[in-house]
Amino acid sequence: MDKRFSASNTPLLAGVVKERTPEAAIEKIRYFEENGATAIDLHLSCFDDEYKTVEHIKRIVDSTDLPMLGLNYSRRYDWTEIEETEEERADLLLKSVEAGIAAVDLLGYSFDPNSRGKFVGEDKYSFTKNNPLEIVTDEAVIEKQKEFINRVHGMGKEVLLSTHPDIPMSGNQIEDLVCFLAERDPDIIKIVTRCNTEDELVEAFDTMRRLKKLNLRQKISFHCCGEMGRTTRLINPVLGSYMCFCTKADDGNRLKEQLDIVTAVNFFKQFGWMDSETK
């Protein structure tokens, strides 16, 4: 199996793993394997501090043949905030790369934490309107992100560049944002906007159709949060989105918008996407 995170020819079903110990993480990964997941989404920050080492992460990576994405959203298992510098947050991602993880999630506000909760740059792009979160336009910060991406590439692994603006955005805005992020040379781009109305839902579907036509080098994953967002997690992969994040149905710390793995697999089977020959 090709363990590159961007290698699949069909949308990935990524099992979300948020656990405190390697043993619990490996058990959850086995559950996802048995129920049809095609990738793993590993929240590194949820581990107890003693397990945030190359050795412990390597145990988890080596436990499966599925491609794995490492994340550090600076939140503990109970989703409370972790106080750490941007360099410390990036260092945990690099530890996972050293441990052999296939790719890491570089948040769009990386190296500029003020951009996490509001837009602080110059409002000169279509996608900087209405106070989007996690969007950086400062060239010095962008250069730091490029350096991180180049470092990961130099270690033979991939980078998913993600941003969660948390506002409704038009297709034009998202298309411009994707092209803007692509200039940093990630391997996958993930954008999560907000979708609360039927009109916004239809716009999200049309946006994904447009993004597919960009024919960029990068794989693109686009879905929404909000009242209507769950539908985009199911339908957007049909329109070209690269990933669907899935959980175990009884997980206490799952996001309400995320689909359970059994539901997602049964849906994806209708398109022949779970057949091994399509991978």
Predicted regions and their residues:
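Short boundary motifs at domain starts and secondary-structure transition points
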Residues: 2-7
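Active-site beta->alpha loop and helix N-cap motifs at the rims of alpha/beta catalytic domains
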Residues: 8-154, 158-159, 166-168
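Catalytic alpha/beta core domains of metabolic enzymes, predominantly
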Residues: 109-279
